[in-house]
UniProtKB/Swiss-Prot annotation:
Expressed in phloem. The keyword RNA-binding does not apply. It holds the Pfam family C2. This is Elicitor-responsive protein 3. Induction: By fungal elicitor and calcium. Phosphorylated at Ser-40 by CPK18 in a calcium-dependent manner. Ca(2+) 2 binds at residues 20, 73, 75, 81. InterPro entries: C2_dom, C2_domain_sf. The gene is ERG3. It comes from Oryza sativa subsp. japonica. Residues 123-144 are annotated as: Disordered. GO terms for biological process: defense response.
Amino acid sequence: MVQGTLEVLLVGAKGLENTDYLCNMDPYAVLKCRSQEQKSSVASGKGSDPEWNETFMFSVTHNATELIIKLMDSDSGTDDDFVGEATISLEAIYTEGSIPPTVYNVVKEEEYRGEIKVGLTFTPEDDRDRGLSEEDIGGWKQSS
């Protein structure tokens, strides 16, 4: 089983639907890979074209098949608004190693709501880095 670190570079978004009618929205992203979830900073007052340029690290195995990035609008005093989400397949990253910042569609209720730019890098974890010997992985260990 391939195991390692997925590095996600959240660059920015463009053309997002503004959920605040009186002023620019304050977008942030929630990144989820299987059970791990991380949150970006809030791009205060950046409206429909926020930039983050933030990096997030996830511990993954090859059975983590997708990264979901949910975009939200931070609202004080009321619940945050859901702007849309992008689902990114991770299958290519395990063979390619890295994917430069690429544009993905942001969707809400099956409709296009803008785009998000994300870069991905996968670094496999060497079994020796985890302190395991060949005998510890799927085999019998000779007792003395």
